[in-house]
């Protein structure tokens, strides 16, 4: 076994690509390392094409092995299970830029498996996984129009940072991943602290420039280790059939795409396609129906694109920079802590916000370490939202990805734990969909958070942009429909405030998207975003002063850290009794901070009173109402505070001489006692005599 290795410096890390030793039965395999973070990438493609398939079956599986971090999995079975949210997100991140680099018409099944086998907690595996995937596909015998370069870009103190580590990202105002070929950007995924458009665009350009070193290294590896590519050519197009279909359907498609309503338009398109197919079958019973369907789809795309390029109104009659009609409502559900209904054209999101305690926060144990997520955003896309039937169950990859994008858009404006000590869960239910439901979720989330009284820094809105480009002519579209997303050349989602961008996601299907085009798209998106924010402000322009009556109110108090054990009690008995008897949730921190949560104000007051009792210090000279707990020959022990007993000596029970303690006191009897002394060992000396009011002195005789 003779390994072929290429190494290069990338930012502050050394990247190594190695092939020829591991997984030699795959079409290609690369062991890719960035520092101590190492991934094994394998690529396998089926030689035989499934003739009946009308799509490209590419599967990307990204898996993190706990042994990579020197851990044993939790749970009963002690092995890795279903993919985590992070694994799903990284699989999507890898899939998006490589998919358009396979040739049109290629329908052989391809599977890419990325396995994290070693991890440095300071180096995230996502970028090296993408680099390794690009290298494996490039040296494989599969048709692939790569290589693909990848870069992570940070922004600190006004400077871009190439491939920042985890600690540097924590201080950065930007976390941007950009992927592209030598001449074109294909994919951008980012989260930002409300940065201006020019800074975001500069980050994309900077990342694309820096990633050329990756492309050059992969080209060198391919020259040395690359396999001969498959002898694959795209199937020849039947020009006669193309012309027949054009004659049968072009005019009808042009008319159908002037229907504004989505369902009417869809029905019209289906009807005209069925009519065209019937006519072709009548002429030739052996016509390839799959080919006909594909050509009708190509014609449909051409008709819509040519109308947009020629300056005709869009599918629903709008101009390129117009946003669909907006309908915005906050506080639409009576018992939720916060809610909103955001409608933009035929896209609608019902969004709810739920407040919880720190105990409700999501605790994540990943190979990068353990962390707590206080803000959660979940996105659901039920089949009825597009007028279809389908399976309902656990979230799919797309739902997880859209939820994370919306989370990135909002996270920058969320308050800190010190400002707002609640865990927050937002759920976006997409009740209607015709384009850009993830950005509707951003808008709805901003509204629901404010309705719940969450003190977010400012409102956030999102917009999806599209692009149609033919030669040197192009049109940038604001607020794209589902059909425009499918038929266009770019999907460009931007979320942000009036001051800047908080999240940017871009997927480009063609080469030739210049910096100028992206700049125009960002400026057009800014105008649309401000328009949406103005409409949102009419529903609610700032967070409510108080949280919902149905939400748990968190009251914070400080106790002596040495008293924490008293509040917890033996085996947790005291705090368990407190929570059960008052109906509150109580959380203790090591510094003595106590958080009491309850929707019932009286319950909170009772919990505070009892905690103050438990943690109170015994004060000399203070009179307490106590309870006799034990009687001995020389006196009685009396509880004056929870967990605090003192001794009333027999001589301190009454003014007269006491011969038998039991003649004066019984266990369970309540008595007033005065603290006379607390010695160095914490023992408390009490007196019943001194707790009694003194008789007034008799007046002097005249």
Swiss-Prot record:
Residue intervals of the KH domain: 552-611
Recorded catalytic activity of this chain's protein: RNA(n+1) + phosphate = RNA(n) + a ribonucleoside 5'-diphosphate
GO cellular component terms, semicolon-separated: cytosol
Major localisation: cytoplasm
Places the protein is found: Cytoplasm
Domain called S1 motif: residue spans: 621-689
Protein purpose: Involved in mRNA degradation. Catalyzes the phosphorolysis of single-stranded polyribonucleotides processively in the 3'- to 5'-direction.
Family: Belongs to the polyribonucleotide nucleotidyltransferase family.
Name of the protein in question: Polyribonucleotide nucleotidyltransferase
Protein's organism: Shewanella woodyi (strain ATCC 51908 / MS32)
The encoding gene: pnp
């Amino acid at each position: 076994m003779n390994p072929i290795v290429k190494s290069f410096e990338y930012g502050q890390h050394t990247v190594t690509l190695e092939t020829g030793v591991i997984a030699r039965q795959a079409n290609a395999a690369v062991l890719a390392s960035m520092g101590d973070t190492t991934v094994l990438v394998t690529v396998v493609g089926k030689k035989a094409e499934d003739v009946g398939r009308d799509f490209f079956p590419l599967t990307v599986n990204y898996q993190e092995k706990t042994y990579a971090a020197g851990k044993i999995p939790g749970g009963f079975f002690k092995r890795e299970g279903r993919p985590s949210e992070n694994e799903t997100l990284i699989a999507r991140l890898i899939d998006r830029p490589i998919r358009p680099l396979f040739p049109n018409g290629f329908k052989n099944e391809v599977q890419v498996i990325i396995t994290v086998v070693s991890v440095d907690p300071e180096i995230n595996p996502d970028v090296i996984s993408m680099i390794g995937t690009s290298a494996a596909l490039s040296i494989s015998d599969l048709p692939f129009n790569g290589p693909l370069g990848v870069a992570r870009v940070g922004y600190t103190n006004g400077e871009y940072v190439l491939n920042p580590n985890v600690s540097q990202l924590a201080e950065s105002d930007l976390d941007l991943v950009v992927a592209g070929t030598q001449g074109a950007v294909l994919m951008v995924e980012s989260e930002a602290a409300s940065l201006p458009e020019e800074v975001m665009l500069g980050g994309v350009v900077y990342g694309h420039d820096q990633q050329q070193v990756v492309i050059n290294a992969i080209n060198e590896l391919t020259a040395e280790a690359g396999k001969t590519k498959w002898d694959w050519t795209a199937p020849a197009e039947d020009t006669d059939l193309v012309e027949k279909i054009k004659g049968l359907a072009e005019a009808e498609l042009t008319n159908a795409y002037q229907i504004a309503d989505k369902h009417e338009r869809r029905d019209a398109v289906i009807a005209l396609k069925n009519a065209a197919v019937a006519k072709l079958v009548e002429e030739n019973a052996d016509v390839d129906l799959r080919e006909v369907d594909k050509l009708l789809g190509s014609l449909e795309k051409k008709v819509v694109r040519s109308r947009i390029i020629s300056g005709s109104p869009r599918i629903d009659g709008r101009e390129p920079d117009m946003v669909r009609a907006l309908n915005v409502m906050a506080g639409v559900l009576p018992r939720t802590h916060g809610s909103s209904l955001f409608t933009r054209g035929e896209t609608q999101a019902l969004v709810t916000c739920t407040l919880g305690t720190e105990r409700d926060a999501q605790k994540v144990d990943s190979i990068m370490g353990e962390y707590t997520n206080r803000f959660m955003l979940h996105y659901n896309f039920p089949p009825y939202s597009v007028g279809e039937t389908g399976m309902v169950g656990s979230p799919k990859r797309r739902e997880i990805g859209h939820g994370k994008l919306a989370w990135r858009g909002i996270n920058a404006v969320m308050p800190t734990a010190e400002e707002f000590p609640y865990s927050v869960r937002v759920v976006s239910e997409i009740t209607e969909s015709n384009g850009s439901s993830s950005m509707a979720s951003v808008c709805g989330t901003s509204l629901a958070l404010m309705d719940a009284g969450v003190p977010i820094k400012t409102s956030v809105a999102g917009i999806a942009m599209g692009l149609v480009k033919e030669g040197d002519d192009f049109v940038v579209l604001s607020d794209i429909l589902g059909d425009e997303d499918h038929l266009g050349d770019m999907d460009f989602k931007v979320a942000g405030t009036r001051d800047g961008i908080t999240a940017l996601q871009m997927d480009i299907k063609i080469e030739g998207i210049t910096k100028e085009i992206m700049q125009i798209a960002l400026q057009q998106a800014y105008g649309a975003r401000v328009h949406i924010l103005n409409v949102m402000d009419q529903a609610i322009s700032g967070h409510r002063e108080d949280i919902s009556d149905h939400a748990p109110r968190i009251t914070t108090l400080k106790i002596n850290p040495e008293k924490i054990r008293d509040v917890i009690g033996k085996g947790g008995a005291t705090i368990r009794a407190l929570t059960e008897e008052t109906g509150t949730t109580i959380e203790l921190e090591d510094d003595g901070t106590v958080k009491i949560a309850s929707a019932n104000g009286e319950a909170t007051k009772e919990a505070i009173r009892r905690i103050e009792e438990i943690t109170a210090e015994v004060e000399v000279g203070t009179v307490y109402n106590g309870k006799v707990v034990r009687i001995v020959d020389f006196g009685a022990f009396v509880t004056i505070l929870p967990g605090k007993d003192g001794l009333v000596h027999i001589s301190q029970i009454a003014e007269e001489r006491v011969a038998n303690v039991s003649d004066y006191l019984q266990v369970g009897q309540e008595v007033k006692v005065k603290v006379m002394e607390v010695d160095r060992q914490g023992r408390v000396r009490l007196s019943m005599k001194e707790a009694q009011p003194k008789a007034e002195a008799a007046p002097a005789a005249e």
